[in-house]
């Protein structure tokens, strides 16, 4: 699995990440959501570089111009509700993309409230067969909900490609998600 850590490179993205992590700023809900959306836009742009492109001829007012455009059929997927601002940021960049959603919630498996589990409630997605699936989730803590979302999504077809975008993440996904989607 290829991991790109955008925080390792100086860019305005680091300002948005700093603000969502800053206790003095994160209480401003609108700014928090907008910063997550902005991060989504930047990540979507960077991830678009991994798509397959072909040259198309476009008629302009001055003549015909060759332009490289993506060939991939992209579907942007997220786990409801926390993922919606990041999902919106991706949609701002991939305006031809399909949408996929999975609803998941955490619950305690024991009376002492020590053991937490994740339950997938429902899934709404187009057929994912031969598509490029971008799963976007702002916070990847244990990776369990991401793993369950992946398993739920592939019941609707095996994507040709999988890319995952997380604002804050840990290394658990290296152990549970495929290095390729096949």
What are these regions (language model features)?
Residues 1-175, 182:
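PRPP-associated nucleotide enzymes
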């Amino acid at each position: 699995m290829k991991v790109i850590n955008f925080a390792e490179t100086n860019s305005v993205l680091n300002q948005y990440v700093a603000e969502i992590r800053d206790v003095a700023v994160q209480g401003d809900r609108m700014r928090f959501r907008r910063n997550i959306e902005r991060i989504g836009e930047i990540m979507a742009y960077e991830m678009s570089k991994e798509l397959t492109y072909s040259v198309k001829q476009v008629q302009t007012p001055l003549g015909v111009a060759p332009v490289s455009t993506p060939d991939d059929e992209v579907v942007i997927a997220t786990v409801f509700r926390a993922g919606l601002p990041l999902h919106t940021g991706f949609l701002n960049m991939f305006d031809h993309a399909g949408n996929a959603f999975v609803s998941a919630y955490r619950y305690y498996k024991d009376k002492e409230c020590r053991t937490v589990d994740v339950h997938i409630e429902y899934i709404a997605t187009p057929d994912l067969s031969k598509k490029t699936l971008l799963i976007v989730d702002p916070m990847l803590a244990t990776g369990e909900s991401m793993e369950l979302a992946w398993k739920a999504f592939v019941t609707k077809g095996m994507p040709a490609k999988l890319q995952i975008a997380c604002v804050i993440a840990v290394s658990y996904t290296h152990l549970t998600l495929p290095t390729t989607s096949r």
